[in-house]
From Swiss-Prot:
Chain residues that bind a divalent metal cation 2: E188
Stated role: mRNA decapping enzyme that specifically removes the nicotinamide adenine dinucleotide (NAD) cap from a subset of mRNAs by hydrolyzing the diphosphate linkage to produce nicotinamide mononucleotide (NMN) and 5' monophosphate mRNA. The NAD-cap is present at the 5'-end of some mRNAs and stabilizes RNA against 5'-processing. Has preference for mRNAs with a 5'-end purine. Catalyzes the hydrolysis of a broad range of dinucleotide pyrophosphates.
Protein name per UniProt: NAD-capped RNA hydrolase NudC
Domain of life the protein comes from: Bacteria
Source organism of this protein record: Pseudomonas putida (strain W619)
One annotated GO molecular function: manganese ion binding
Motif segment (Nudix box): 173-194
Subunit (UniProt): Homodimer.
Top EC class for this record: hydrolase
Ranges that cross the membrane: none
Annotated catalysed reactions: a 5'-end NAD(+)-phospho-ribonucleoside in mRNA + H2O = a 5'-end phospho-adenosine-phospho-ribonucleoside in mRNA + beta-nicotinamide D-ribonucleotide + 2 H(+); NAD(+) + H2O = beta-nicotinamide D-ribonucleotide + AMP + 2 H(+); NADH + H2O = reduced beta-nicotinamide D-ribonucleotide + AMP + 2 H(+)
Length: 276
């Protein structure tokens, strides 16, 4: 959270406030951004699946209108969440990232996973409830580790076939049941590039709402092994000198922060700050 944005469970029965609208194509925007007067937005011809009270931005209540489909609204368009992450007001991006996670979770938990009956929102906590099963479902968060492996002035970067052409990044992967973040790190590095690491240090974390990851950032030192790329997962992996790096991930991502932080420390430059 930030001084401007705090999440909260708000009753949609209350009036007023701001609202954001999310469709399969992203968030509704106009020349002023993605926040709209709630009363005005609810008067538009929108196919609303559900409404969620999600928190306060600059002291004002904020609600999410989760839509079944995209609609035409005069003077407005639709914009994907990633573009908000890359540029603009980062506090607003956090509002939209939270909204996206809540909208995705509630959409995917409309029916009980045990008995198949419809679930209802609990008004006093962020949960969906099945009365026949007495079962609560809470928002999903998927812990993932992301690590910069270093060897003196060299850093180990890789690229996936899914990356933007030419871009290299740090190694990352989801934690498995029963694993610590450190266990996950060692396993993922070994699986993806067949390298062993040591001196694992936690650096920081970042919410990654695509759709519901929590990125746990680490630095680790190379301990041994030759790079062997995991088929279908790693397109290329190699050591790069900190003074001769390839195209890198977006500046607001934790992947870029891990790289920039290490380069700054090796070069005696001011350390960057991780956007939170």
């Amino acid at each position: 959270m930030s001084a401007r944005w705090t999440s909260a469970v708000l009753d949609p029965q209350i009036t007023g406030g701001w609202a954001v609208a999310r469709s399969p194509e992203g968030f509704l925007v106009d020349a002023n951004g993605a926040l709209f007067p709630r009363d005005w937005l609810k008067r538009q011809d929108l196919d609303v699946l559900a409404e969620h009270g999600i928190g306060h931005f600059d002291g004002e209540p904020v609600f999410l209108l989760e839509l079944r489909s995209t609609a035409e609204v005069p003077g407005c368009g639709w914009r994907g969440l990633r573009s908000f992450m890359l540029e603009g007001d980062f506090d607003l991006y956090k509002v939209l990232g939270y909204a996206a996670q809540i909208g995705t979770w509630a959409r995917e938990h409309r029916f009980c996973g045990s008995c198949g009956q419809p679930m209802t929102q609990i008004r006093w906590e962020r949960a969906m409830y099945c009365q026949p099963c007495d079962l609560r479902s809470y928002p999903r968060i998927s812990p993932s580790m992301i690590v910069l492996v270093t060897r003196g002035d060299e850093i180990l970067l890789a690229r996936s076939p899914r990356f933007v052409t030419g871009v290299y990044s740090t190694l990352a992967g989801f934690a498995e049941p029963g694993e610590s973040a450190e266990d996950c790190l060692v396993r993922e590095v070994r699986e993806e590039v067949a390298v062993e690491v040591t001196n694992i240090q936690y650096v920081g974390s970042q919410c990654w709402p695509f759709p519901h990851s929590m990125m746990l950032g680490f630095h680790a030192e190379y301990a041994g092994g030759e790079i062997v790329m995991q088929p279908d997962e790693i397109e290329d992996a190699r050591w790069f000198n900190v003074h001769d790096l390839p195209p890198l991930p977006a500046g607001r991502s934790i992947a870029r922060y891990l790289i920039d932080l290490y380069v700054a420390r090796r070069s005696g430059l001011p350390e960057p700050v991780l956007p939170r």
